[in-house]
From Swiss-Prot:
GO CC annotation terms, alphabetical: Gram-negative-bacterium-type cell wall; plasma membrane
One GO MF term: acyltransferase activity, transferring groups other than amino-acyl groups
Organism encoding this protein: Shigella flexneri
Protein name: Lipid A biosynthesis acyltransferase 2
UniProt-listed PANTHER family: LIPID A BIOSYNTHESIS LAUROYL ACYLTRANSFERASE, LIPID A BIOSYNTHESIS MYRISTOYLTRANSFERASE
UniProt KW keywords: Acyltransferase, Cell inner membrane, Cell membrane, Lipopolysaccharide biosynthesis, Membrane, Plasmid, Transferase, Transmembrane, Transmembrane helix
Single Gene Ontology BP annotation: lipopolysaccharide biosynthetic process
Length: 314
């Protein structure tokens, strides 16, 4: 990655063509090729492949199962297994959908997209307000930002670099296909804040586990998690509205609904860190609860526990 003043821009390197990465390029080529087929044809096929891959990915499946058992203890083992299967199906469908958007562009793609809460975006544009979208970790998480960038909005987001440099290069190139800025989490949050203050629409994912030092333990579904209560600070420093957003893909209708919810400003403006953390988790619950298969449950979301509790992912 090549570093510029306040952003990272993907940079191709010759060693990406070495034999060690040939299989990666083959898989990426397959994804690009499959994205050219109509969703009505490819989605059922991708669902079967995704569920099959999910059965083989034992470690990832185990993490997802642990997360779901803690968050939804009222569900049966069978119900949770169905969610995990559907999650892996959604994952592959979303990756291919992102490739389709990057290759074919947004014109036809947008015909299969519905913005629920579009009036909120229009009000932001009308008032020329700074905004940070609070976006739970869904499989289609990059697509709304790409669509907004394609509409001419300046977007800024933070990202984690992938272990495979070819995947990292391609993925971040796709994210920037229609413009916008990417900020590495390794550089801290200041470059992201700077972009928001410059009028970029921020894109913040709130649900990663950052450890106990700066986090607050707050209720999360039926359990709790260590949540970094940073959005209050981001709102104040960036003078930005905090707008929840979450994409949901319907594999049967082949339609993406992007839900935009009213600003969180009123409920966090005077709240302490513990209340802010709870409001963040509550927002994730509202957006994800009715569509759990859309969420990336394979993350170690609940790794940080209270002092008397063991790591749930031994």
């Amino acid at each position: 990655m090549k570093k510029y003043k306040s952003e990272f821009i993907p940079e191709f390197k010759k060693n990406y063509l070495s034999p060690v990465y040939w299989f990666t390029w083959f898989v990426l080529g397959m994804i690009a090729g499959i994205s050219m087929f109509p969703p009505s044809f490819r989605d059922p096929v991708l669902a079967k492949i995704g569920r099959w891959v999910g059965r083989l990915s034992r470690k990832a499946r185990r993490r997802a199962t642990i997360n779901l058992s803690l968050c939804f203890p009222e569900k049966s083992d069978t119900e949770r297994e169905i969610i995990v299967d559907n999650m892996f199906a959604t994952a592959l469908q979303s990756i291919v959908m992102m490739a389709e958007l990057a290759i074919r562009g947004p014109e036809k793609f947008q015909k299969r997209v519905f913005w629920k809460g579009l009036e909120i975006l229009e009000e932001i544009r009308h008032n020329n307000r700074n905004v940070i979208f609070l976006v739970p970790h869904g499989w289609s998480v990059d697509i709304p930002a790409m669509l907004l960038a394609a509409q001419g909005e300046k977007m800024a987001a933070m990202f984690h670099q992938q272990r495979n440099p070819v995947i990292d290069y391609v993925w971040n190139s796709v994210r920037r296909k229609f413009g916008g800025r990417l900020h590495s989490r390794e550089d801290g949050i200041k470059p992201f804040i700077q972009s928001v203050r410059q009028g970029y629409w921020g894109y913040y994912l709130p649900d990663q586990d950052h450890g106990p030092e700066y986090s607050e333990f707050a209720d999360f579904f039926a359990t709790y998690k260590a949540t970094l209560p940073i959005i209050g600070r981001l709102m104040n420093i960036s003078q930005a509205m905090i707008i929840p957003l979450f994409p949901v893909y319907d594999e049967k209708k082949h339609f993406l609904t992007i839900e935009v919810r009213p600003p969180m400003d009123a409920c966090i403006a005077s709240a302490d860190n513990k209340m802010i953390a709870r409001q963040m988790n509550k927002t994730v619950e509202i957006l994800v609860g009715s569509h759990p298969e859309q969420y990336i449950w394979v993350l170690k979301l609940l790794k940080t526990r209270k002092s008397n509790e063991a790591d749930p992912y031994p």
